[in-house]
Regions:
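Positively charged, low-complexity intrinsically disordered leader regions
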Residues: 1-31
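Short beta-strand segments
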Residues: 39, 95-99, 164
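Glycine-rich phosphate/diphosphate-binding loop of Rossmann-like nucleotide-binding domains
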Residues: 40-54, 136-225, 237-248
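Short beta-strand elements in bilobed, periplasmic/extracellular small-molecule ligand-binding domains
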Residues: 57-71, 185-187
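Short, well-structured alpha-helical segments in soluble
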Residues: 77-89
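Anion-binding alpha/beta catalytic cores of soluble intermediary-metabolism enzymes, centered on
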Residues: 93-156
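Short glycine-/small-residue-rich Rossmann-like dinucleotide-binding loops
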Residues: 99, 209-211, 230-231
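Rossmann-fold NAD(P)-binding glycine/threonine-rich loop
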Residues: 106-123, 127, 230-282
Length: 284
């Protein structure tokens, strides 16, 4: 029996309806959430991502400002823009669109963002608080993936969860979130020996490695929940890290690419921005 689709479009639209109400409640108190996006250079994919974020802000009534900076922007100029946004009380969220041009130090730039305005959840303080199970801003993609599992009513506690990928942006925070939900978590990566022996026992399998259709049906056990975080372009078409058609015949639930976790990532960016605005408004 084919797997049930975890539809990111539907779930993101549902979340946006909830966020609209929260934004309206803030505006009734005279407070409008604000997001500043810093885009350096003219990378086409980054331009698309930023455009999608601007559209999401417009739908929800969030004030959006994009600082478009040339590719030869200096580190000093980038850092000055971040400090200016930090100091602006009308800005609740700051996002530096990655990747940055190679001559720029992205880690240093991200470390300058105030943790409470770090709506991407990449700041070392937010990452550290997540590892301790403390209140923090959570990275949007793993937060979105977890939201999809919970929204679908999929049990997590006590389940075997395997995360393939150990990036700071997805793999590590995903593993920590699943651990907080009382799953038994294994992280696999490029040096894992006999990967299929690990993925084959997963009740929940998260693929976040950036290799098109890498997870094949023989690596997945019957009835597994498969979350595909990958976004790859092959022959002009988008695909994930999972070989979707054959795997969907074995899994109980699966996220599609496109239309899966990617849709939730932007929705969670909006959620983080609204939450930051709510905290700022409460402190006035």
């Amino acid at each position: 029996m084919p797997a049930q689709l975890l539809d990111g479009k539907v779930m993101a639209a549902e979340l946006e309806e909830e966020l609209k109400k929260r934004v309206e409640a803030l505006k009734e108190k005279g407070y409008t959430p604000g997001l500043t996006v810093i885009l350096v250079g003219d990378d086409p994919a980054s331009q698309t991502y930023v455009s999608n974020k601007e559209k999401a802000c417009a739908r929800l009534g969030i004030r959006s400002r994009t600082l478009r900076m040339p590719a030869d922007t200096t580190q000093e100029t980038l850092e000055a823009a971040i400090r200016e946004a930090n100091a602006d009380p009308s800005v609740n969220g700051i996002l530096v669109q990655l990747p940055l041009p190679r001559h720029l130090d992205g880690d240093r730039a991200l470390s300058l963002i105030l943790p409470e305005k770090d709506v991407d959840g990449f700041h070392d303080i937010n990452a550290g608080r997540l590892s301790r199970g403390l209140d923090c801003v959570v990275a949007c993609t793993p937060k979105g993936a977890l939201h999809m599992l919970k929204r679908a009513g999929i049990p997590i506690s006590g389940k075997e969860a395997v995360v393939v990928g150990r990036s700071n942006i997805v793999g590590k925070p995903m593993a920590l979130l699943l651990l907080q939900e009382n799953a038994t978590v294994t992280i696999c990566h490029s040096r894992t020996v006999d990967l299929a022996s690990h993925t084959g026992r997963a009740d929940i399998l998260v693929a976040a490695i950036g290799k098109p259709r890498f997870i094949t049906a023989d690596m997945v056990k019957d009835g597994a929940v498969v979350v595909d975080v990958g976004i790859n372009r092959v022959d002009g078409k988008l695909c994930g890290d999972v070989d979707f058609e054959p795997v969907s015949q074995k899994a109980s639930y699966i996220t599609p690419v496109p239309g899966g976790v990617g849709k939730m990532t932007i929705a969670m960016l909006m959620d983080n921005t609204v939450a930051a605005a709510e905290k700022a408004a409460a402190a006035l």
